[in-house]
């Protein structure tokens, strides 16, 4: 299992980094962590698999 961060930049409006990442599986969310700004996106690279966005509470939610 693995993930790749494809965009990583400082957020203009909040202190911290906002990312976009591609994951092999949903289980990779645990490895990715939650040390990013709300609005960060993680996409599972599998047909029909969900995408996730980090909310203000620091929880990855399916979008």
Predicted features by range, described:
Residues 48-58:
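Short beta-strand segments and strand-loop junctions that repeat across beta-rich extracellular domains
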């Amino acid at each position: 299992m693995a993930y790749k961060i494809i965009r990583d930049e400082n957020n203009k409006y909040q202190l911290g980094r906002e990312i976009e990442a591609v994951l092999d599986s949903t289980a990779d969310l645990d490895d990715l962590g939650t040390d990013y700004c709300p609005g960060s996106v993680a996409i599972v690279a599998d047909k029909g698999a969900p995408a996730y966005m980090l909310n203000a509470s620091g929880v990855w939610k399916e979008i």
